[in-house]
Regions:
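Conserved HGGG/HGGXW glycine-rich cap/lid loop of the alpha/beta-hydrolase fold
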Residues: 55, 60-108
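Flexible "cap/lid" loop of the alpha/beta hydrolase fold
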Residues: 152, 156-157, 163-197
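Short, hydrophobic alpha-helix immediately C-terminal to the catalytic nucleophile
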Residues: 80-83, 128, 152-156
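Gly/Ala-rich beta-loop-alpha elbow adjacent to hydrolase catalytic centers
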Residues: 143, 147, 151
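Alpha/beta-hydrolase fold catalytic core
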Residues: 2-67, 92-93, 118, 136-137
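Active-site loop/oxyanion-hole signature of alpha/beta-hydrolase fold enzymes
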Residues: 52-54, 60-62, 100-142
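Residues at the starts of beta-strands that form the adenosine-phosphate
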Residues: 94, 138, 161-164
């Protein structure tokens, strides 16, 4: 086989692979999710919902007075991560725990205008607006895992609103990591189409 024939064959194979990667995901049927129930039907009697930055945010409040503790859960968790400590901690002041976007009973938009509600900056903005709407001027932020990252970013942007910062096994990077190709790949139309299956 001639060298040019081998190159043509490799080119055709690479072209077919590229075509499969670009078009293939759209050929996978994504049925509507069955058996979905509204978040309000799944909520506990002490659950509350507040419209924050165009999202219905699920949260709970226990206790009263100062200090105010705001509990930020980790990846794949929810307000229920904190249920064992909310009651005892409420003896010291007001405890607020909320479900960050994509977790628990907080709304999960599949489409949006502008910045993704799942971005780091949107998480900080949501916490700031949640505090504003509830009327909290300063708080002790308690962040676990990815919630620790949100707490730290919030402190860096709004130090005047943070009385103390408690980080529990935080997912905090000491060097800048932008996500690079992983973030780019997850934002492609192909991955957004397949997202509900994952």
């Amino acid at each position: 086989m001639k060298k040019s024939s081998k190159l043509q064959l490799v080119g055709v194979i690479l072209g077919v692979i590229l075509l499969i990667l670009l078009v293939g995901p759209f050929l996978v049927p994504v049925p509507p999710l069955a058996g979905l129930q509204p978040a309000m039907e799944l909520a506990d009697p002490d659950s509350r919902f507040l419209e924050v930055n165009n999202l219905a945010v699920h949260y709970k409040i226990m206790g009263e007075g100062k200090p105010v503790f705001i509990l930020l859960h980790g990846f794949g968790a929810s307000v229920y991560s904190w249920q064992a400590i909310m009651e005892p901690l409420s003896q010291m002041g007001t405890i607020i725990a909320y479900d960050r976007p994509a977790f628990g009973l907080t709304e999960r938009p599949l489409e949006w205008e502008g910045e993704s509600p799942y971005s780091s900056q949107a998480q900080v903005d949501l916490l700031n607006e949640l505090m504003n709407q509830i009327g909290i001027q300063t708080a002790i932020l308690v962040g676990n895992s990815a919630g620790g990252s949100v707490a730290m970013q919030f402190y860096l942007q709004y130090p005047e609103k943070v009385t103390a910062l408690i980080l529990v096994d935080p997912a905090v990077y000491t060097e800048h990591w932008s996500g690079g190709s992983v973030k780019w790949m997850l934002r492609t139309p192909q991955m957004r189409h397949l997202g509900p299956l994952l």
